[in-house]
């Protein structure tokens, strides 16, 4: 049994409520200590502290495993006559991302992440964006033209009326393009090839 200065034994818990088996687990929890074989009374709230300590110890143990992994690879290289001076500098930065996933990066890793994130933006600004803008209307117009020709051959009056309304709305939008270009200037490539051919299109007759 435990002394008065040590941890509380199960028999001394009777002062809280008669019958240890009938204790409410939401008010009083008993955690087993495997080292001393005693029971410690723990109230709700201290469990979060214990879980925080457990997670912190696991993270420290994970860091130790990473360090041992790096040292073992260096020992393999040392016996082959390879110069490990450069490996000592590059290996911690290369394996830090694989071992530690807690959001801590080195300066070299942050620089590499910024370069990879800005790479698509640089390629878009060098001319591929204008090429993509030109390919999208061509594909859309080719599909729309095929559908319109099929509908006109079938002679559906309602379908032809819907197409006529769509074309009239498109022409109305073309009339507003000069005002939009003054507010938001576009590239000359998009202005010359996308606006002028559409102005020559006439709406199909409604039969």
Swiss-Prot record:
One of its GO terms (cellular component) is virion component. Changing residue 194 to V: In strain: Isolate ATCC VR-759 and Isolate clinical OC43-Paris. It is found in: Virion. Changing residue 30 to P: In strain: Isolate clinical OC43-Paris. It comes from the Viruses. It holds the Pfam family Corona_I. CDD domains: embe-CoV_Protein-I_like. Belongs to the coronavirus I protein family. This is Protein I. The gene is N.
